[in-house]
């Protein structure tokens, strides 16, 4: 009995000893490890205290120049004077309303940055008041409006408004700014939506991020996918508020616009010749006017497909009119560039046809008549899901998406700015543009 008691005592002592050793070692190791508050933030799992939430990305800081009024509101005044809206300059030009036209992005971006930050929820950028804090600089010139101040109106020599003088004045003003000179304009953003906007000074502002409709009038060393942002035109027809369906869309194919265009737009006249005698096809010549916009709205809202040929350059506002009308775009423009293609697959709601094929008699209408109602409804659903991207009035629409695209340019801007400071001499035989090139020169087709 005594022997058994002795064994139990020794076993108990051994267990207590093991427990004591474990406690001592555990305390020692714990003291040698940092707590979670001592670890760098990037080493702590995000979902430990906020499961499921994506890391918050810092907003890009944008400084908007307070340009002289002659580059902003003064252009609204000049436009109104040229059309008899006002007889003489007004005391406060900021009370004037920006006129409606297809390149209104410049007004919407300007207005967005003038809003209080509390009204800009969800924007990928934040406006800063000190240029020293800025990542990017926005130049809010109304360059597209400047082009149409005297559109279709004769101007006597030495009098009236001059778009060329405005451009020269703008670039001289910019080149006088410390922040422009610092990086040769690379970290500046300039709206140039009309293909002819700023044409006189492009070589002096080509380092900047240009907001463009396409690259039809730009040389490779002036504009590129990597450096610049392709933006949508402002739609000129009313948004279609009905449901998807084809019951009230009795026209197969609709087009209303200028029949005669230059360059790639010459395809329009040829399409007229091919299509104007086809049944259930409406194709009309028409220029910009309120009456024609009403007719175009009705036509697009009652058609299954809308023809989108090239204009003077590969792009045209009609594509965006088609999308907001839920009228399936039929695109005949071999070199067209499209906005926001990193988030939008246009093939899901558009039909692309190579120009030579489209000009074959009967080809287009036969192809369209073979498309089943089910497929048209799929196109319409997809258009309805993405059309906010092309609506400048939508709080989560075009303006926010343009700023997102602009913010993505920042890493390249920093790279190129640092690289330019480093390189002293470059022996180049061709222009060095920061462009994304393809080794394919022909048309790329897919079935």
UniProtKB/Swiss-Prot annotation:
One BP annotation, GO: pectin biosynthetic process
Cytoplasmic-facing ranges: 1-6
Record region (Disordered): 32-52
Tissue expression summary: Expressed in root vasculature, cotyledons, leaves, stems, vascular tissue of sepals, petals and stamens, pollen grains, mature siliques and abscission region of seeds.
Enzyme nomenclature, EC number: 2.4.2.-
Lumenal side: 30-447
Transmembrane segments: 7-29
Positions of glycan attachment: 427, 432, 439
One Pfam family cited in the UniProt record for this chain: Exostosin_GT47
Any one Gene Ontology cellular component term annotated for this protein: Golgi apparatus
Keywords: Cell wall biogenesis/degradation, Glycoprotein, Glycosyltransferase, Golgi apparatus, Membrane, Signal-anchor, Transferase, Transmembrane, Transmembrane helix
Biased segments, Low complexity type: 32-41
Functional note: Probable arabinosyl transferase responsible for the polymerization of arabinose into the arabinan of arabinogalactan. May function as inverting enzyme using UDP-beta-L-arabinopyranoside. May be important for arabinan side chains of rhamnogalacturonan I (RG-I), a major component of pectins. Cell wall pectic arabinans are involved in thigmomorphogenesis response of inflorescence stems to mechanical stress.
Subunit details: Homodimer and heterodimer with ARAD2.
Family that this chain belongs to: Belongs to the glycosyltransferase 47 family.
Listed name of the protein: Probable arabinosyltransferase ARAD1
Gene designation: ARAD1
